[in-house]
Regions:
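Active-site metal-binding core of divalent-cation-utilizing nuclease and nuclease-like domains
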Residues: 1-25, 31-35
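Non-catalytic C-terminal interaction segments of nucleic acid-processing enzymes
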Residues: 20, 33-126
């Protein structure tokens, strides 16, 4: 049970153990893309969030992933994007795109603040 107020009703608030510390993030699943207006409202809520500083969007397809991630390209918050199918197979090793550093990297690196990149074909997000 959470004992703090959050700005948005997220699909889940997840806490994982990384090495010597815990990392908490908001998890959102996007099966289909929303309108730009809806995403503008969501981005505003996430920008105003004070209790959570990391966010993960998992998408059902490449088309949805591109649409969702593009809406957050100017966000000042740490929002990462990946595929639900990868999450099921790899969990913390899921490759996520991170607009803060404009690269793909393992989710565990994104949660720990590491800037370690991974190699992904350049056309993946072209």
């Amino acid at each position: 049970m959470m004992d703090f107020a959050i700005a948005k009703d997220y699909d889940a608030i997840v806490t994982v153990r990384l090495e010597e510390r815990d990392a908490t993030f908001a998890l959102e699943y996007e099966r289909s893309a929303k309108s730009e207006t809806q995403y503008a409202e969501i981005v505003d809520k996430i920008e105003s969030e004070i209790e959570i500083d990391r966010f993960l969007y998992l998408a059902s397809s490449e088309q949805v992933l591109r649409c969702v991630s593009w809406q957050f390209r100017n966000s000042k918050r740490h929002v990462c994007f990946g595929f639900l199918a990868d999450w099921y197979q790899r969990l913390l090793d899921t490759e996520v795109f991170d607009w803060k550093c404009h690269q793909y990297r393992p989710l565990r690196a994104a949660l720990s603040g590491s800037t370690y990149p991974i190699q992904v074909p350049s056309q993946a997000f072209a």
